[in-house]
């Protein structure tokens, strides 16, 4: 496929241009096998008619592939000085990095949870939003309790994720924070609002394709955005405050990660 050809080319260029060994390993032994397995799982999804295991696994591999590509691109831009230089560590950098990393993990969990909602046909377990069939608290039916539980969990995690992203945005406003982290936190805040509204539209429109597809797309955008915030905040936390780091990207020691 085109994607596989591009990844093989990327792995070749990473080796030919003398990129760090970590980048070479990620491209050759990470991305290429992941995409191969993704293609195989895609066939399995069709063969067993969208079973929840294959659907969720297919999405998880796609998100991991997207995550590795995001890391390779962000790292290349940083090393080549084609983006805003990572500033030296500031007060609270390590804590900010932990918040960003935890938020990115929660985005991944929420995406997989959403695929389970789809796989178990739980998208309309409750047909109103923001209420649960007109009630403030969900009322569970013993026959459909598992599907209803998935639906409720997906909603609650969405609210928790929104709160974490807002907390990241507030924390990123502190002096000395990497401006890229500030911008990505602001973008993630906007994306999570759009994502929740699309989730509501899915229920109001009874899972029409014109809202379901954008819901998945915005989720992938949110995943990528949070990964950039997590990578950049980690690189800043790992940076050493020396005269060289202030000299710019051409002279600053690069973080090992």
Q: Language-model segments: what does each one mean?
A:
Residues 1-257:
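Polytopic transmembrane helical bundles with strong interfacial aromatic enrichment
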